[in-house]
Curated annotation (Swiss-Prot):
Its main location: cytoplasm. GO terms for cellular component: cytoplasm; nucleus. This is Protein YAE1. The complex LTO1:YAE1 may function as a target specific adapter that probably recruits apo-RPLI1 to the cytosolic iron-sulfur protein assembly (CIA) complex machinery. May be required for biogenesis of the large ribosomal subunit and initiation of translation. Belongs to the YAE1 family. The gene is YAE1. Keywords: Cytoplasm, Nucleus. May form a complex with LTO1. Residues 28-53 are annotated as: Disordered.
Length: 147
């Protein structure tokens, strides 16, 4: 029943049941040859479960960093797309507003409102793959009808 301490430094290993060495009491499990000096995991201020928590924390931080990076990239990409398309959208809005103003008070006004809704005006059919506007037949149709 001797402690495996060397030069006054305890490594927490003992070969028999609890033993008092000097003024220090050593506790350990009889089933383990490499036992802790702590009676339970709660006695260890560093927490024996730290190595199992570290990968989980690392995964959480990695995932959050990935999500933050994606969000930043999407925001900057969306802003660039907005800046490029703003002029086109503004021009279409002015054209639709002009048509609606010219048809105000006429029987054609209700038909113009139905046809010139935003989903029709900004439909993919009016744009190529690079989102450059082709001829906008709907706007041209209404402009020709009003001339």
């Amino acid at each position: 029943m001797s402690c495996a301490c060397q030069d006054g430094v305890c490594n927490g290993k003992m070969d028999k049941a609890t033993k008092t060495v000097g003024a220090e009491t050593h506790a350990y499990s009889k089933t383990s040859s490499n036992t802790s000096i702590h009676e339970s995991d709660d006695d260890d201020i560093w927490g024996d479960d730290e190595p199992t928590q570290t990968p989980a924390v690392k995964r959480i931080h990695t995932k959050q960093g990935y999500v933050d990076g994606l969000a930043h990239a999407q925001e900057s990409s969306l802003q660039a797309g907005f800046d490029e398309g703003y002029g086109t959208g503004a021009g279409l809005g002015v054209a639709v507003g002009s048509i609606l103003a010219k048809t105000w008070g006429t029987p054609a006004y209700d038909e113009a409102r139905r046809e010139l809704v935003i989903t029709n005006v900004l439909s993919r059919q009016w744009f190529d793959n690079d989102l450059c506007m082709k001829k906008h037949a709907l706007i041209q149709k209404w402009n020709q009808n009003l001339d």
